[in-house]
């Protein structure tokens, strides 16, 4: 992925670290804020209240997620820790401290090595990342080592551990295969639209196994691959597992492939050469990572978080505290459908801990707009579940973030089963690249269209079709855009709407 050079990021982070409003405790590098400072910092314009963002500075690709020693560890080459993936403690702004000058630390992952396969000790956390050498026009894979529970990492003198002389060879994900007692790396051969598989006994010496691709959407690039097993949630194979390969494509979307891995090659099922199956239908979900469970404590549950932005415009967004934020955590599973395997994504259940008192509405839609009262006071920090009857021909939907003549429009047509999300009218700033619509075919379930919606200060996530289609969008609505409306072409459609105010995770 195209990144800001590491020395630029380092300078920005170090400058931010010198700001007088924050202090660091020796040894743990944990930032401490007074309640007044926290109130000021986390009430900046556009600051989301329950989507994670760094206190200050750049945050883009998730760079290694793991569950270990009873905590979720979340990296963007800063680091935050969490016990529930709802509340976060930012413990380091820059985990790599001694990378040679001129080398950029690009996307990668972090693993725990309790069996000491690498020889750095059984307490070691090891980051596997891409070194970008702009002068040599070369990308290679390297490792760094932590002995303070993953908060700071030291450069390995034997780097790079994998260098094939490519300019675009990046974004490793590394997992432990217990069956073979080997490490497996998936890494992108970006401009070839391929993912390469390598194996190693010690994270230092890597042997090529196979390449996957080109496949699916291959217009410009493959990058940021992730590889994991998922349980099937229905049908005759319910409870069994398949391998899933997720690849970020063309700097603005993700696609996935489902199949089997024989220890050497990944064999995708139902492979289509020219079209991919998308992880998310919105423009702002990219470079997602799943949490690798080194405690063996998650009972097979797989959680994912993605970067909610887009390389087409991310550097130009009007955020005062930095650039970028992450999605809500999603629990993943697989579903067997008439169209093949489909990824199911549902908000992590612990998010319900943020809910306040529910407000409930029901009735029949009238032709035109119906303003939902009392929602504007929630300030675009809420969760909603809405269902519409689909038995009669109609076009209806919701207007979110309504105010000052602007809104996010969600429209459904019962005849075509088309759901369209239009954000061309929502942002309170002008940027042509941001003016986008997205859509998908959404089949009714038991005669109902059901949408599970998360609205935050500058983004919206919409889960539809029981989690098989998700729309993630940045919105950047103005402070007065807090209204919610229902609308309908014809009258008579039954609806139910439940809304919960959500507490800020920063308090």
Which ranges hold each PLM region?
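Generic detector of low-complexity/intrinsically disordered segments
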Residues: 14-16, 21, 164, 400, ...
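Bacterial Sec-dependent N-terminal signal peptides
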Residues: 1-28
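Beta-rich carbohydrate-recognition and catalytic domains
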Residues: 24-171, 176-222, 231-281, 299-300, ...
